[in-house]
Structure formats: structure tokens, C-alpha cells
Amino acid sequence: MNLRSVGALALILGIGTAGAALAQDDAEERDMEAEHCVRVDDVDDIDIVDAETLIFRMRGGEVYRNDLPHECPGMRSSDTLMYRSSVGKLCSVDIVTVLEDWGFGFAPGVSCGLGMFHPITGQIADEMIRAAE
């Protein structure tokens, strides 16, 4: 490999490294905007988009997208969710449980961990729900 080839290779590797660093910066910036917790008293409604995504609609108009860290198998948009909080907050370390409708009552189903709460607009939330239908 001659000196020119080494220089070109270093430039290519440098560009790739810079691109990866920029992508990491973008991800960190999005996470900086995200909230670890929301107040339980402020939760007005929870929409299930799919087995990996929830939409939290808050009193006061805020809307958050919660990307679950792992797929929640069997969770459907028509399901009802249950959660418990001893501190008045619902956080990214907490768990939601799908309530199974047995016709004569509900029984706990699968439980799944929450992710970070990413602020989004109501319009984006509505578009996500429509796209998932």
C-alpha cells in the first residue's frame, strides 16, 4: 500500500468515524429531550400503537411517545393497561401490565417495561396510530 492509499484510507475511516459520532450526538440530543418519568396524576390516556410503542396523552396537552425497550408480545391497540406507582410517577424503569378481558372480568396478562418518554405533538401521535391500524 503506497502513501496515497494510506491517506485515502485514513480519510475514509475518518469520515465514517465522524458520521458515527454525529449519529450518536443526534441520539443523545433526542434522549436529552426525553423524560425519565411523568406524573401519574397528569396521565389522561394511554394509546397502544403496537407491541413496542405507547402514546401517553397528558392533562394540559402534552403528548409523549414511549418506545418499550423490548417488544410486549400479545399487546394490541384494543387492550387495557394497568400500572402501579408508589411515588406518584410513572418512570422508564416501571412496568405496565396488559389486562385480559375474559368477558366476566379482567385478569392480568403480559407485563412489559417502559422506556423513556419522548415529547411529540398530538398530530404525530394521531398519525402513528392511524398508520398502525
Where are these regions (language model features)?
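Positively charged n-region of N-terminal signal peptides that target proteins for export
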Residues: 1-5
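Short, functionally important structural connectors and interaction interfaces within domains
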Residues: 7, 29-30, 35-38, 104, ...
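Bacterial N-terminal signal peptides
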Residues: 7-17
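Sec/Tat signal peptide C-region and signal peptidase I cleavage site
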Residues: 17-23
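N-terminal secretory signal peptides
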Residues: 23-78
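Helix-rich interaction surfaces within compact, conserved domain-sized segments
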Residues: 70-133
